[in-house]
Amino acid sequence: MAEAERIIGTPDIPEAAGAEPEQADGESGGAGAGTERPKGRRRIAVLFAVAALAYAFDLVSKLIVVAKLEHHAPIEIIGDWLRFEAIRNAGAAFGFGEAFTVIFTVIAAAVIVVIARLARKLYSLPWAIALGLLLGGALGNLTDRIFRSPGVFEGAVVDFIAPKHFAVFNLADSAIVCGGILIVLLSFRGLDPDGTVHKD
């Protein structure tokens, strides 16, 4: 009887032994999934922190310019090479396309939506910084287009940084350009927003 029980019970031993590694694998997989989520949240936090800073600097600078500089003589910062001069720009960044204010407003809103959707898969710190700059800059100029005259979605953006022989721009434009340049560099290096690196 004991011999029969031994023969019958023997096949169960490998299965029982095999079940433990599977359980361990499942536990390690769960631990891996748990470590990825905080990483993603940290990158999203960086994205929105950078966007908030860029937006705040742009908003405060425009409020100061409108209150202190508009309808006044330009202020020379570096001789006539760099001045602060308040103007209203109905076009895109650096004064381009003034006849398409509504179109640029829609584009800015679309960029914000795309960045918000992309944030769910954001695991790369450099991409978080780049997209944060884009988001903050887009929000800054979109705020002007919605709330400033002559009307909703047709408002003129406040520009004030006036280098010699160059278009007048603002801090939101600077954030957008810096974010765009960083995205191009990251793309050339093969770094994706989810943190993976690929080589063509």
UniProtKB/Swiss-Prot annotation:
It holds the Pfam family Peptidase_A8. It catalyses: Release of signal peptides from bacterial membrane prolipoproteins. Hydrolyzes -Xaa-Yaa-Zaa-|-(S,diacylglyceryl)Cys-, in which Xaa is hydrophobic (preferably Leu), and Yaa (Ala or Ser) and Zaa (Gly or Ala) have small, neutral side chains. It is an enzyme of class 3 (hydrolase). Signal peptide: none annotated. GO terms for molecular function: aspartic-type endopeptidase activity. GO terms for biological process: proteolysis. Pathway: Protein modification; lipoprotein biosynthesis (signal peptide cleavage). It is found in: Cell membrane. The chain crosses the membrane at residues 46-66, 96-116, 122-142, 166-186. It is a multi-pass membrane protein. Residues 1-37 are annotated as: Disordered. The active site is at residues 159, 173. Keywords: Aspartyl protease, Cell membrane, Hydrolase, Membrane, Protease, Transmembrane, Transmembrane helix. One of its GO terms (cellular component) is plasma membrane. Its EC number is 3.4.23.36. Belongs to the peptidase A8 family. HAMAP family: LspA (MF_00161). This protein specifically catalyzes the removal of signal peptides from prolipoproteins. This is Lipoprotein signal peptidase. It comes from Streptomyces avermitilis (strain ATCC 31267 / DSM 46492 / JCM 5070 / NBRC 14893 / NCIMB 12804 / NRRL 8165 / MA-4680).
